[in-house]
Swiss-Prot record:
Its EC number is 3.4.11.-. Binds 1 zinc ion per subunit. It comes from the Eukaryota. Its cofactor is Zn(2+). This is Membrane alanyl aminopeptidase. It is an enzyme of class 3 (hydrolase). GO terms for molecular function: aminopeptidase activity; metallopeptidase activity. The lineage of its organism: Eukaryota, Metazoa, Ecdysozoa, Arthropoda, Hexapoda.
Amino acid sequence: DPAFRLPTTTRPRHYQAAIPDFSAGA
């Protein structure tokens, strides 16, 4: 999924909410 490659600031909120480890790590 391309969204996983985007910075946390541009990634959709639902991705950040569903995957906090990606949000914090990226």
